[in-house]
Each structure stands twice: as structure tokens, then as C-alpha cells.
């Protein structure tokens, strides 16, 4: 298995107010500082009549927020390369946003795929996992 990074997503449920875009930029900066990652660029877009997206391009990957005020949801995404743990963002986000619930998903980004392969039928998915295993068996061990 070749791991390239860690990825978390948070769905922040039950938000009742629409936050100013500057709040998200400050939170991204706080998360970047806590995770010890480098922000290269921040891009944002305000939708009409509501909603907002902000993404920070990092030297180590990205952080993003997408808001859905009409549904009371803020979606957060943090993908990091190397040994950086994106979970440092969780406590910051819990403190910064009013919410009733947060759904966290975390996973490694790697070559070992036991997830749904969108290009294969169920029968071929199993073949895909077997082929991947055979590739790793045939590769010389790296030390």
C-alpha cells in the first residue's frame, strides 16, 4: 500500500445562522496554524441568494468549506499529504460554529482501495482488489 495522505470531512449540522465569509477565512488560518501547514492561496465565492464556498490551496493539499444555509449545513473538507493529521481541525470547528451535530468521516488516501470503485460493476470491483493485491505481491519489497 502506498499512502499519500489523510482526509477528513465534516458535515456540521443544525447551523442556524449564515456566517460572514471572513469568519471562514479566520478559521482556515487557525486550522492551518494548528496543523502546521502552509497556505498558498485562498479563493472564495458567494452564491446568490445564499451560500458560500471557500478553498485554501495548501503546500500540503487543501482545506475547504461549503455552506448550505437553507439546509442548516456547513460541509468541511481537509486533505493533507505526508504525516500531517487533519483531525486538529475538529476541535476548532466545534468551538467556532453553532451546531446540533457533526458527522466526521476520515480515511487514508492510498492505493489500497476497499471502497466503491465508480468505474466497475460489483463483480469487477472484487477483481480490482485482487489485481491490486497481485501488483503489490509482484513488486520488490522496498526497505
Regions found by a protein language model. Name each.
Residues 135-141:
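Conserved small/polar residues in nucleotide/adenosyl-binding loops
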Residues 80, 141-142:
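Ser/Thr-centric signal marking residues that sit
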Residues 1-58, 67-134:
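Mature, function-bearing regions of proteins
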Amino acid at each position: 500500500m502506498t499512502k499519500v495522505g489523510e482526509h477528513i470531512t465534516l458535515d456540521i449540522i443544525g447551523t442556524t445562522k449564515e456566517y460572514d465569509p471572513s469568519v471562514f477565512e479566520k478559521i482556515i488560518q487557525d486550522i492551518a496554524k494548528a496543523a502546521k501547514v502552509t497556505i498558498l492561496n485562498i479563493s472564495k465565492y458567494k452564491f446568490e441568494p445564499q451560500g458560500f464556498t471557500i478553498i485554501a490551496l495548501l503546500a500540503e493539499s487543501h482545506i475547504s468549506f461549503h455552506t448550505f444555509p437553507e439546509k442548516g449545513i456547513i460541509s468541511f473538507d481537509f486533505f493533507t499529504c505526508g504525516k500531517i493529521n487533519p483531525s486538529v481541525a475538529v476541535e476548532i470547528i466545534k468551538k467556532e460554529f453553532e451546531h446540533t451535530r457533526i458527522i466526521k468521516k476520515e480515511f487514508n488516501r492510498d492505493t489500497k482501495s476497499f471502497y466503491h470503485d465508480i468505474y466497475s460493476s460489483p463483480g469487477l470491483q472484487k477483481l480490482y482488489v485482487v489485481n491490486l493485491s497481485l501488483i503489490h505481491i509482484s513488486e520488490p519489497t522496498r526497505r
